[in-house]
Amino acid sequence: MPSLDDILKPVAEAVKNGKKVTFFNGAGISTGAGIPDFRSPDTGLYANLAKLNLPFAEAVFDIDFFKEDPKPFYTLAEELYPGNFAPTKFHHFIKLLQDQGSLKRVYTQNIDTLERLAGVEDKYIVEAHGSFASNHCVDCHKEMTTETLKTYMKDKKIPSCQHCEGYVKPDIVFFGEGLPVKFFDLWEDDCEDVEVAIVAGTSLTVFPFASLPGEVNKKCLRVLVNKEKVGTFKHEPRKSDIIALHDCDIVAEKLCTLLGLDDKLNEVYEKEKIKYSKAETKETKMHEIEDKLKEEAHLKEDKHTTKVDKKEKQNDANDKELEQLIDKLKI
C-alpha cells in the first residue's frame, strides 16, 4: 500500500510545474476548527439538532420554516458565527498557494468564511451556499449591516428589518433558495480551465455543487481528500484520479512538505493560534465584565427594591396610625 507521500507526489509535481489548483471544499475541511460537519452519524450538525425540536433536521436551513420560526436557525447561528473559530491548516495551505501564484479558485459549500479569515482574497472565493458576510430581509430584501445583526444576536433577539419588520437572515443559501449568480458565472468561465482539482471534505451529495468535479476537462488532475470515496470518484472514476482517504489537515501538511512550504505553514498556523487564543481570552474577560456589571445592576436593583418595600411598609404604618388618630378625634 503506497504511503501518503507517494500518493501526493504527482499533485506536488503538477503545482511545481506551474499548474494552478482549483479547490472544491466541504464541511470536512473545517472540522479541525471545531465546527461540526452536517451528515456524520454521531457528530454531524444534523445529529445534534434534537434540542431545537425541529420537524426534520434540515428545517433549520429551510427558507419556508425560517419565515415561520427563525429562532432555531439563530440558536444554531450563535455557535457557527464567524469569529468563533480559527482557520485550519488546510485553510492556510490554500492561502500559501495563493501567495505563490498557484491558486485558480476556491469553490466552497461552507458558510463559515474561514477561507477569508485565512487571508484568501475575495476574487478567488465562490461561496456556493452563501455566507455570513452580508444579510438581507427575507420580505423586502433590504440589507442589514453585519454589526447591527450581531447586536441583535448578542441581545438574544431575532433580527428584524428596520423598514418592514420582516425577519432578517444572513445571505446563506437555504433549501428553497437559488444559488448565487457568481457561482454559475464563474463556473462557466472556469470549467474547461481547471488544471488540478482538489476536492476536500465533501460528501458530494448536494447539487449542483456535487456535479462540478465531474464536469472538469479530461486532462485535469483530480484529487479527492476525504474519509471515503464519493461522487464521480466512486461512480465514474478516472484513471488519473488521486485518492487520499485521510484527514484534510494531514494532507495539507504533507503537500506543504512536498512543496517546501511546511515551515511557512507551521509559522502562520502557530501565529494564528496565538492571535485567536488572545482574542478568545479577551472575549472571555469581556463576558466576565458584562456578567459582573449585570450582577451589580441586579444587586443595586434588589437594594432599591428593598428600600422601596421598607418605605412602602413605613408609609402603610403611618397611614394606619393616621387613620386611628382620625377615628379617635371623631369620638
Swiss-Prot record:
Record's subcellular location: Cytoplasm; Nucleus
Coiled-coil region list: 276-331
UniProt domain Deacetylase sirtuin-type: residue ranges: 1-262
Disordered: annotated span: 283-319
Keyword entries, A-Z: Coiled coil, Cytoplasm, Metal-binding, NAD, Nucleus, Repressor, Transcription, Transcription regulation, Transferase, Zinc
Active site: H129 (proton acceptor)
Sample GO molecular function, one term: histone deacetylase activity, NAD-dependent
Residues where Zn(2+) binds: C137, C140, C161, C164
Residue numbers binding NAD(+): 26-46, 109-112, 201-203, 226-228, 248
Cellular component GO terms, alphabetical: chromosome, subtelomeric region; cytoplasm; mating-type region heterochromatin; nucleus; pericentric heterochromatin; rDNA heterochromatin
Name of the protein this chain belongs to: NAD-dependent protein deacetylase HST2
Organismal lineage: Eukaryota, Fungi, Dikarya, Ascomycota, Saccharomycotina
Gene for this chain: HST2
